[in-house]
């Protein structure tokens, strides 16, 4: 009887330890270092475990459709166990207090981060913008790229003191200036890319490697989605604008801009202005501390000046 009690106690102890660290979790030391965003798992472990059941259900639901985006993505991207990556991405979204994306969007966003890490640096923001990155996503990318990323989780107050905040504010200003550029800006950019094809080559086509993204925007244009639907699906207004101009170049016909204008206006209304964003991430800094933003190499000065609504 005594031996039976000892055996039972041993089984309970083993089960308890297994429950504390799920098998295959990023909290397992053997797996921890193999993930670029593993540090977020440790900081959000309890939160993630509570969400684990929902994430696994989402995985099964999404995987059941052979034509789904998930199935197509998994055919050429295999970074690790799907549910672990989703849980980590969900933790990042929670940390940023971003609740507008679905679980699948979080996972796809991580794939975009991983792809961009090898193609861009802090000062080369054009490719990040034209690929459809939003400023909140760019901040996560900066966190991942930073050598201080392991310290960010333990001391969030240290983050605004680094050069990352300046990079992020540069990105936001550049992002908004490209959404509402000066007249004839895109024509000048096209001419600078390839003067001999200035009137026929679609903007950024094959230059930044986003042919697939523009083709996806083409489908959205063909479907004639409403502004509300595009906002709900988090369509990038910049890519939508570029796709419209690419179609105009292809067909030679002018496309009505009224929907694009409503789309941009609705999109901007969902996100804070630059001033509000500064207050949010850098509340203790003196006003205007980060407002002197350097010009971008290779771009005209008039492109860098932000729209008036950013400087009320």
From Swiss-Prot:
UniProt keywords, alphabetically: Host nucleus, Secreted, Signal, Virulence
Record's signal peptide: 1-20
Top-level taxon: Eukaryota
Cell compartments where the protein resides: Secreted; Host nucleus
Cellular component GO terms, alphabetical: extracellular region; host cell nucleus
UniProt keyword Membrane, yes or no: no
Motif RxLR-dEER in this chain: 46-61
Family of this protein: Belongs to the RxLR effector family.
Role noted for this protein: Secreted effector that completely suppresses the host cell death induced by cell death-inducing proteins.
Name of the protein described by the UniProt record: Secreted RxLR effector protein 14
Organism field: Plasmopara viticola
Gene designation: RXLR14
């Amino acid at each position: 009887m005594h031996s039976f009690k000892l055996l039972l106690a041993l089984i309970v102890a083993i089960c308890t330890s297994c429950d504390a660290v799920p098998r295959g979790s990023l909290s397992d030391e053997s797996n921890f270092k193999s993930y670029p965003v593993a540090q977020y798992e440790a900081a959000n472990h309890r939160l993630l475990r509570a969400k684990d059941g929902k994430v696994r259900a989402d995985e099964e639901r999404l995987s059941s459709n052979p034509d789904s985006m998930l199935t197509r993505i998994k055919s050429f991207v295999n970074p690790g166990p799907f549910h672990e990556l989703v849980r980590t991405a969900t933790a990042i979204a929670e940390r940023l207090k971003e609740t507008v994306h679905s679980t699948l969007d979080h996972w796809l966003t991580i794939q975009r981060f991983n792809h961009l890490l090898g193609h861009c640096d802090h000062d080369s923001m054009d490719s990040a913008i034209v690929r459809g990155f939003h400023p909140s996503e760019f901040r996560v990318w900066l966190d991942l790229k930073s050598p201080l990323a392991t310290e960010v989780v333990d001391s969030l107050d240290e983050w605004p003191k680094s050069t990352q905040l300046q990079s992020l504010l540069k990105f936001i200003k550049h992002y908004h200036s490209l959404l509402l550029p000066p007249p004839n800006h895109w024509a000048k950019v096209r001419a600078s890319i390839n003067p001999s094809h200035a009137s026929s080559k679609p903007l950024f086509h094959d230059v930044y490697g986003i042919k697939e993204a523009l083709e996806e925007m083409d489908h959205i244009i063909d479907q004639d989605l409403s502004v509300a639907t595009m906002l709900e699906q988090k369509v990038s207004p910049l890519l939508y604008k570029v796709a419209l101009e690419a179609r105009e170049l292809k067909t030679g016909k002018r496309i009505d801009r009224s929907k694009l204008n409503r789309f941009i206006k609705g999109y901007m209304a969902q996100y804070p202005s630059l001033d509000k964003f500064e207050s949010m991430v850098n509340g203790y800094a003196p006003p205007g501390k980060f407002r002197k933003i350097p010009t971008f190499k290779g771009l005209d000065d008039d492109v860098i000046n932000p729209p008036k609504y950013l400087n009320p």
